[in-house]
From Swiss-Prot:
Superkingdom as given in the UniProt entry: Eukaryota
Motif (SPKK motif 5) on chain: 24-27
Crosslink position(s): Glycyl lysine isopeptide (Lys-Gly) (interchain with G-Cter in ubiquitin): K137
Protein name: Histone H2B.2, sperm
Amino acid sequence: MPKSPSKSSPRKGSPRKGSPRKGSPKRGGKGAKRAGKGGRRNVVKRRRRRRESYGIYIYKVLKQVHPDTGISSRGMSVMNSFVNDVFERIAGEASRLTSANRRSTISSREIQTAVRLLLPGELAKHAVSEGTKAVTKYTTARR
């Protein structure tokens, strides 16, 4: 839920304390003309919504594997769609496993089983070992 701008905090486009309002006439000729235009006072620009993406992480992995290789924006878009698709598949399968076992929380065990079910052979083995390594690293860093 977005916060409404408060009167005490100056924002871009809103008047500050002590300064004349945008629509009020000033001593110059421009201010008097602005007062004549109706409904254009206190125009606050809408902030652009940030688009979430795995782009920075994909780029970091690319540089680890091939330091001298770049990626186009179209290629990044394809990779981002791929990661989102795999994420949704794993989350969906883990959710089904959780409900089948009459539990309410998805644990690392369900994620691991979902990965084994979804990915073929050697790819599943590598994914499980990397996931286990990541969870171990996370739990040791928390202590």
